[in-house]
């Protein structure tokens, strides 16, 4: 078992939601935003090195290419920089806390949030974990979730306990359009 030492991970500065990583001499711009991804990248690096020590042909360039190429669609995924749009499929308090931490560390302000939830998830805790992240939250009913989808009005009622401005929308597309019209600096 190889466990990376957290003190050996040296975060680097970059643009908002960029994740520069320095571990064991491997300096890479990770495609996975969020400092919570750096220990994961260190584990991946150690795993590749362990395989190399066992005779696998893995060179330093391959490790760096892997670190740069790793993706998790819809997990703090920047899909546009102008306008600034991030997609995150967090569906529980822990995922929401990771998103909130990443947004706060990036010092992103003036953001709008678009959110839909499943009725069987811990919606109130998830909303509380995102407190302070959005100047305005637009709620939607997830279109493909079937009977598990929490109605946009119900989500808005819960969200009003946490967010200063909440608007009910019919679809995510409507919410994104409205957020852009309202002039927010970015949308998550």
Describe the role of every protein-language-model region:
Residues 1, 111, 165-167, 188:
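Hydrophobic anchor at the start of a short beta-strand
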Residues 24-136:
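Nucleotide phosphate-binding/pyrophosphate-handling subdomain across enzymes
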Residues 15-20, 84-86, 127-186:
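C-terminal helical cap/extension that packs against the catalytic core
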